[in-house]
Protein backbone atom coordinates (compact mmCIF):
# COMPACT_ATOMS: atom_id res chain seq x y z
CA UNK A 1 0.00 0.00 0.00
CA UNK A 2 2.89 2.34 0.76
CA UNK A 3 4.32 1.75 -2.72
CA UNK A 4 0.95 2.58 -4.28
CA UNK A 5 0.89 5.83 -2.32
CA UNK A 6 4.39 6.68 -3.59
CA UNK A 7 3.39 5.95 -7.17
CA UNK A 8 0.22 7.98 -6.87
CA UNK A 9 2.23 10.91 -5.50
CA UNK A 10 4.41 10.82 -8.63
CA UNK A 11 1.61 10.56 -11.14
CA UNK A 12 0.78 13.27 -13.61
CA UNK A 13 -0.05 16.71 -12.25
CA UNK A 14 -3.26 18.51 -13.06
CA UNK A 15 -3.69 20.25 -16.39
CA UNK A 16 -1.54 23.33 -16.79
CA UNK A 17 1.07 22.21 -14.28
CA UNK A 18 4.61 21.22 -15.23
CA UNK A 19 5.01 17.56 -16.23
CA UNK A 20 6.67 15.16 -13.81
CA UNK A 21 10.25 14.03 -14.48
CA UNK A 22 10.04 10.81 -16.53
CA UNK A 23 13.07 9.42 -14.66
CA UNK A 24 11.18 9.66 -11.37
CA UNK A 25 8.08 8.14 -12.91
CA UNK A 26 10.14 5.24 -14.30
CA UNK A 27 11.78 4.69 -10.91
CA UNK A 28 8.37 4.30 -9.31
CA UNK A 29 7.67 1.40 -11.71
CA UNK A 30 10.50 -0.57 -10.10
CA UNK A 31 8.45 -0.98 -6.93
CA UNK A 32 6.31 -3.63 -8.62
CA UNK A 33 8.20 -4.45 -11.81
CA UNK A 34 11.59 -4.87 -10.11
CA UNK A 35 14.73 -2.72 -10.23
CA UNK A 36 15.62 -3.91 -13.75
CA UNK A 37 12.07 -4.47 -14.97
CA UNK A 38 12.35 -8.22 -14.35
CA UNK A 39 9.08 -8.65 -12.50
CA UNK A 40 8.54 -11.33 -9.90
CA UNK A 41 5.45 -13.53 -10.02
CA UNK A 42 2.52 -12.55 -12.20
CA UNK A 43 3.46 -8.90 -12.75
CA UNK A 44 4.38 -8.43 -16.43
CA UNK A 45 8.09 -7.70 -16.96
CA UNK A 46 9.13 -4.41 -18.53
CA UNK A 47 12.71 -5.51 -19.22
CA UNK A 48 13.31 -5.74 -22.95
CA UNK A 49 10.02 -4.09 -23.93
CA UNK A 50 10.21 -1.41 -26.59
CA UNK A 51 8.92 2.12 -26.16
CA UNK A 52 5.88 1.63 -28.40
CA UNK A 53 4.73 -1.49 -26.51
CA UNK A 54 5.08 0.20 -23.13
CA UNK A 55 3.23 3.32 -24.30
CA UNK A 56 0.44 1.23 -25.84
CA UNK A 57 0.03 -0.77 -22.62
CA UNK A 58 -0.12 2.38 -20.49
CA UNK A 59 -2.75 3.91 -22.78
CA UNK A 60 -4.78 0.69 -22.68
CA UNK A 61 -4.72 0.71 -18.88
CA UNK A 62 -5.54 4.42 -18.73
CA UNK A 63 -8.43 4.14 -21.18
CA UNK A 64 -9.94 1.06 -19.50
CA UNK A 65 -9.25 -1.22 -22.47
CA UNK A 66 -6.95 -3.57 -20.54
CA UNK A 67 -8.03 -5.17 -17.27
CA UNK A 68 -5.85 -4.51 -14.24
CA UNK A 69 -5.87 -4.23 -10.50
CA UNK A 70 -3.49 -1.30 -9.97
CA UNK A 71 -2.23 -0.08 -13.35
CA UNK A 72 -5.50 1.55 -14.44
CA UNK A 73 -5.41 3.70 -11.30
CA UNK A 74 -1.78 4.64 -11.85
CA UNK A 75 -2.09 5.38 -15.58
CA UNK A 76 -5.37 7.27 -15.27
CA UNK A 77 -3.75 10.65 -14.64
CA UNK A 78 -1.13 10.51 -17.38
CA UNK A 79 -1.60 12.57 -20.55
CA UNK A 80 -0.17 11.16 -23.78
CA UNK A 81 2.96 13.32 -23.51
CA UNK A 82 3.90 11.82 -20.13
CA UNK A 83 3.06 8.29 -21.24
CA UNK A 84 5.45 8.73 -24.17
CA UNK A 85 8.17 10.16 -21.92
CA UNK A 86 7.97 7.43 -19.28
CA UNK A 87 7.78 4.69 -21.94
CA UNK A 88 10.92 6.11 -23.57
CA UNK A 89 12.71 6.21 -20.21
CA UNK A 90 11.73 2.65 -19.25
CA UNK A 91 12.69 1.25 -22.64
CA UNK A 92 16.09 2.98 -22.44
CA UNK A 93 16.81 1.92 -18.84
CA UNK A 94 15.61 -1.68 -19.00
CA UNK A 95 16.91 -2.92 -22.36
Regions found by a protein language model. Give the residues of each.
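Bacterial N-terminal signal peptides that target proteins for export
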Residues: 1-2
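Electrostatic cytochrome c docking/interface patches
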Residues: 7-27, 42-44, 55, 60, ...
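Gly/Gly-Pro-rich "capping" loops immediately C-terminal to redox-active cysteine motifs
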Residues: 21-22, 36-66, 72-76
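The canonical Cys-X-X-Cys-His
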Residues: 27-36, 86
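Residues at helix-coil transition
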Residues: 34, 63, 91-95
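C-terminal capping alpha-helices of c-type cytochrome domains
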Residues: 76-95
